[in-house]
């Protein structure tokens, strides 16, 4: 929720300094988490970590929007979001290696007795402070303009003003609204995917640490391939067809949907099963560049960070919450009714997420008209 306020703030102030503040803030409270003595002392720092994290993506996307041409924004936004598949991969690899008693001794020592969970928080916090302060070395050209012009538009922009402009954009641009809606439906699938590793262990017979390691390796390469493919091809699609990038996601989702269904029911020794696993991480990498670039292109420049913050609020608060909570409830309700409750729950939420397909199609068809209307209005 704080992201909406931080997004509006990013449209008014020096963005490099704001990113530095946000990263340093959450890094300090990450270190504070390592000193926690109980639930309250762990929960309170997490709240401030969320405030700091809410600054990064809206502000970064706004910076990218000002420094990359529109026809290359799909790749730029996708490359920024490369952190998602890589972060998932690293976490799975760490979980797999730490849980596996056959892991290399140096890994067990480093992540276990030598540092411990508190030490991990301290280490990440110190690293974050260093990275945050390094942002002060980058200059925000727009920030310089704000300082030198006392009557700039950014100075005049208030939070309520930004919300009015955003609401007007949502009313007047079906492409914007449907791109956001498609993102929400996709994140319902991602929310349900919190049970993916449990499904692989409980209903497909994998060892927990082994499948975590395998998934981590797949996530690295498939995620990277997805980021490059999604960014470059969606930019090419827009340039050659003048159809919005969501049309690219429409075709991608439509083509990959049958494989996503089939691999839920085949044996893990078959090729189609592993193709399905790879495609899941590949599609994740493809998603972010086209959608984040599109939502920025369909609003006035002065609220780019605000619309990104609103988009993140929607996909997290609605998409991930509905997906994770709904799938968990469905698993509990179907245990004892179905032999494989995780399989059916993931499949059902996969079909719910498939509602992204018509959303992206209509958004892509409307894109050129809505973009032209925006440029005329400006």
Q: Can you describe what each PLM-predicted range is?
A:
Residues 133-139, 257-266, 347-378:
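Multi-pass alpha-helical transporter architecture, strongest
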Residues 80-140:
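Helix-loop-helix hairpin linking two adjacent transmembrane segments in secondary transporters
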Residues 17-31, 245-261:
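Structural signature of the two symmetry-related core transmembrane helices
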Residues 44-85:
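Cytoplasmic helix-loop-helix junction between adjacent transmembrane helices
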Residues 141-178, 203:
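Juxtamembrane intracellular "pre-TM" segments in multi-pass secondary transporters
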Residues 1-39:
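Conserved MFS/SLC helix-loop-helix module at the cytosolic interface between two early adjacent transmembrane helices
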Residues 14, 35-41, 52, 69, ...:
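Helix-breaking motifs and short loop linkers at transmembrane-helix boundaries and internal kinks
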Residues 169-230, 284-288, 292, 319-327:
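Extracytoplasmic gate region of multi-pass secondary transporters
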């Amino acid at each position: 929720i704080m992201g909406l306020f931080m997004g509006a703030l990013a449209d008014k102030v020096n963005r490099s300094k704001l990113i530095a503040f946000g990263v340093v803030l959450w890094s300090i409270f990450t270190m504070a988490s390592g000193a926690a003595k109980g639930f309250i002392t762990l929960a309170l720092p997490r709240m401030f970590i969320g405030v700091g994290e809410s600054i990064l993506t809206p502000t970064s996307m706004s910076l990218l929007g000002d420094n990359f041409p529109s026809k290359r924004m799909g790749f730029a936004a996708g490359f920024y979001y490369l952190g998602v598949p890589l972060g998932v991969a690293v976490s799975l690899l760490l979980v797999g290696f730490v849980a596996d008693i056959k892991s290399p001794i140096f890994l067990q020592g480093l992540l276990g007795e030598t540092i411990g969970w508190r030490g991990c928080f301290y280490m990440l916090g110190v690293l974050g402070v260093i990275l945050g302060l390094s942002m002060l070395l980058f200059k925000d050209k727009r920030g310089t303009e704000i300082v030198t012009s006392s009557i700039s538009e950014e100075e005049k922009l208030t939070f309520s003003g930004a919300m009015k402009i955003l609401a007007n954009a949502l009313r007047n641009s079906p492409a914007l609204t449907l791109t956001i809606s498609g993102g929400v439906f996709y994140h319902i699938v991602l929310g349900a995917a919190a049970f993916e590793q449990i499904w692989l262990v409980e209903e497909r017979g994998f060892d927990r640490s082994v499948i975590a390691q395998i998934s981590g390796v797949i996530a690295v390469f498939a995620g990277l391939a997805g980021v490059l493919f999604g960014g470059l091809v969606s930019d090419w699609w827009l340039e050659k067809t003048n159809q919005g990038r969501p049309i690219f996601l429409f075709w991608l989702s439509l083509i990959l949907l049958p494989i996503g269904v089939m691999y839920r029911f085949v044996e893990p020794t078959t090729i189609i099963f592993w193709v399905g696993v790879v495609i899941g991480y590949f599609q994740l990498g493809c998603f972010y560049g086209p959608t984040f670039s599109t939502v920025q292109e369909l609003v006035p420049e002065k609220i780019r960070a605000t619309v990104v913050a609103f988009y993140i609020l929607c996909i997290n608060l609605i998409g991930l919450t509905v997906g994770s909570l709904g799938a968990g409830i469905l698993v509990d309700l179907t245990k004892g009714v179905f032999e494989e409750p995780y399989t059916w729950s993931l499949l059902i939420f996969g079909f719910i997420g498939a509602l992204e397909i018509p959303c992206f199609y209509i958004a892509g068809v409307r894109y050129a008209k809505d973009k032209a209307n925006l440029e005329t209005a400006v």
